[in-house]
Amino acid sequence: MSRSTLYVVTHFLCITASCAGLAATQSRAETYPARPVRLIVPFAPGGGTDIIARTLAPKATDAFAQPVVIDNRGGGGGTIGAELTVRATPDGYTLCLVSTSYATNAAIFKLPYNPITDIAPIALIGETGLLISLHPSVAARSVKELIAMAKARPDELNYASTGTGGNTHLVTELFNLKAGTRMTHVPYKGTGAAMSDLLGGQIQLIFGSLPSVLPLHRAGRLRGIGITSAKRNDAIPDIPAIAETVPGYAATVWYGLWGPKGLPAGIVSRWNTTVRRSLQLPDVKERLAGEGLAIADGPPQAFIDVVQRDVAKYREVVRAAKIDPVQ
């Protein structure tokens, strides 16, 4: 066989193999899902991320005609569930729904995965603020009064977080930096435990996700005094933004969906479309608007954009607050 003939045959075989690979990928996307999909929530039940997941999972179940099963894998501030997803086979049957803690963890932990390059982004779901929520025994009725109290009693006010390095931790440390206060961090293994101690009065406050604390604020069991987003939230317009008292302070919590790196583009596209359509359903819009969530509507890249933004932001918070990285 001549060199030219060998080249033609080899080139043909390469093209054939490539086309076969593309056809197989397309076929998988068209027949997907053929069995239940596991949606990992890297936190204990009851928190904002869990509530968002349980709102969207039934809609995805209807759209795909296969169960989308919530798998709560709490621990490590969300890193355990995230690593489990990163290590999963990229076939679309293991996905992960995360919050801002996914980015804040990268600012404080030495992670066994890269939160940007080791994943396949699917969709940004929405953004909102956290609510400074006080136990009723705390006398402060405003952000200004809380700052005055914290300055008069440095390190005496205890604030809860859902874990070291999580968004409830670093958003509060950003407040300490901007307001010139010192409040003591008490980390918990999830929202449920933190809220239990807050309601019991063992902890004085939390910068809590709206899905978790808003019902308690409305019931009078907690007192919300300030929202972390740059502007007031339409769900609670009577509560001022912290920035009205502390100029330049702003922090949001977002929710997003992703899968393991190598997830076929067709599966990513189907999930992105399903999430965006689900977010426009009247009952979903009403539920999430009631939780104060501003719904997103964009391509997978929108998720990566907010991750990159917040990894950089909270690395600076960790540095400025002199928080020791966790190895």
Task: Please state what every model-predicted region is.
Residues 25-118, 156-158, 164, 180-207, ...:
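N-terminal (or domain-start) structured segment
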